[in-house]
Amino acid sequence: MFRQSVFVIAIALALSGCAGRGEVLNNDPFERSNRFMFKVNVQLDNYVLKPVARGYLYVPSPVRRSVRNFFDNLAAPVTLANDILQLEGKRASTTALRFGINSTVGIFGLFDPAKRLGLEKHNEDFGQTMATWGMPEGPYLFTPIYGPSSPREFSGWIFDWMFDPMTHQDDWDLEKAIGRYAVDGIDFRADALTTLDEIERSSVDFYATVRSLYQQNRKSEIANGVTDIDDLPDLDALDDLDDF
């Protein structure tokens, strides 16, 4: 039930950034075990995360938006480190400015004045960085709790964890980490309720759809949104995720 640790959160991120349909190789030699874990995580979502997310929608929208802004701001140092490692000077400058402005004027990231100044948010992680360095992703994996991934992306998550400033606090422990990622994950899941339900209802094979969306999204993220793949069919609910 953590941000990007719960498979539905990873799907929500994939849907919000997915750029196209394209010819994407499945690269899924462990499909049988992956499908089993997918079913397990679907049940965890149905009986744990989804009910909590529905209740979270009763929290006023401005409060939920501030929660989202806060967690986005916490992720900025990780994005900045990867911007630098990818030699993306302009994007690194944008990330640094956003973090500085939102951490001060935005009151520890609760608000996003940087966006009103034209400094748009983007996300980077070490999985993307390794891809730009030419490291192969390895086979598709659907892991317990963490969700859609690959050996490259999973190892990248460990590196990103090291650059997360929260992990270096003296009083940081497992209980605080679980609380942080649980709230973050519930917030994302609440935003994606309608979208994911629509995707599941319209999919002949929900597992294959999730796999395809995830792989396409990672391809788009690695290319910083510049791809040569065709547009996906429009889904109105996807537009609602773009601001989160």
Where are the regions a protein language model picked out?
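Bacterial N-terminal signal peptides that target proteins for export
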Residues: 1-7
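C-terminal motif of bacterial Sec signal peptides marking the signal peptidase cleavage site
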Residues: 14-17
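A structured, mid-to-C-terminal "fold-capping" secondary-structure block
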Residues: 20-21, 31, 134-244
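Terminal hydrophobic membrane-targeting helix
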Residues: 24-32, 57, 61-68, 85-89
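Post-signal peptide N-terminal segment of mature Sec-exported envelope proteins
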Residues: 25-50, 54, 72
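Short, residue-level hotspots on alpha-helical faces of the histone-fold
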Residues: 50, 69, 98-102, 106, ...
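Surface-exposed patches in mature extracellular/periplasmic domains of secreted proteins
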Residues: 62-65, 86-93, 115-116, 221-228
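Mid-length scaffold segments of soluble, non-membrane domains
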Residues: 73, 77-151
